[in-house]
Amino acid sequence: MQLTLDSKFATYVPPKSQLLKWVGNKQKFAGQISKYFPANYNTFYEPFLGSGAIMATLSPSSGVGSDIYKPLIEIWDTLKNDPNLLVEWYKERVERIGNESKKEVYDSVLETFNKNNNGADFLFLTRTCYGGIVRFRKSDGYMSTPCGVHNPIPVETFRKRVKEWNHRMKNVSFVASDYKEIFSNAKEGDLIYCDPPYSHSQSILYGAHDFKLTDLLECISEAKSKGIFVALSIDGSK
């Protein structure tokens, strides 16, 4: 749904609920952030996709969502191309709770995931980890977030969310790549939205340990010189 405010800006309606439980997601602010986007653009790019809140809010007619972390992109790609499988991934793990304690299931899935990173395990972990904080050890890259105190949402609730998000993401392609590749692919008239790792999170996030804001700002400057629209969310207090 799109309501034009004036000739330059538009407003959008965010999804009703998050698909992934993800700390730092922009679900609450997606409508406000998108007000600053131009109403007319070609392809929408989001190179730090994360929770996908902005992409889903815009539900673009042409979009590219990317992230450096492959298991995350596996989730988004499955959402678009095989949503029923995504539900089965979640159901298979959630329904183990009852025969085993929530913590036992979580620890088991976490152990499997750390041995072989994959989207199916990562989906469950994002929805059940403590506070939605997806934390990785710098020493070995293992996810180290403990089990959360909350109960995971019911399978049918998750299924309804998948249906809505699948519809919103139907025109989006998902790729696992570095943000610099996305900038190199964008053309004049395209829009890039960047929500990079904040300074206080760079010690715990996947792919964030070597991130340099100065490099991103150089990419943004070059993109703008080519007639590409760029929007940036940044931790101004740091």
Feature map (PLM): residue ranges:
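The conserved SAM/SAH-binding core of class I Rossmann-like methyltransferase domains
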Residues: 66, 177, 233
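A short acidic (Asp/Glu
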Residues: 56-58, 75, 185-186, 203-206
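Short active-site oxyanion
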Residues: 40-44, 61-62, 169-173, 224-230
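Beta-hairpin (beta-strand-turn-beta-strand) motif
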Residues: 68-69, 126-128, 235
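Amphipathic, non-transmembrane alpha-helical secondary structure
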Residues: 31, 56, 180-184, 217, ...
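Conserved S-adenosyl-L-methionine
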Residues: 36-97
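SAM-dependent nucleic-acid methyltransferase catalytic core
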Residues: 2-29, 35-39, 82-193, 197-204
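Conserved acidic-Pro-Pro-aromatic motif
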Residues: 188-238
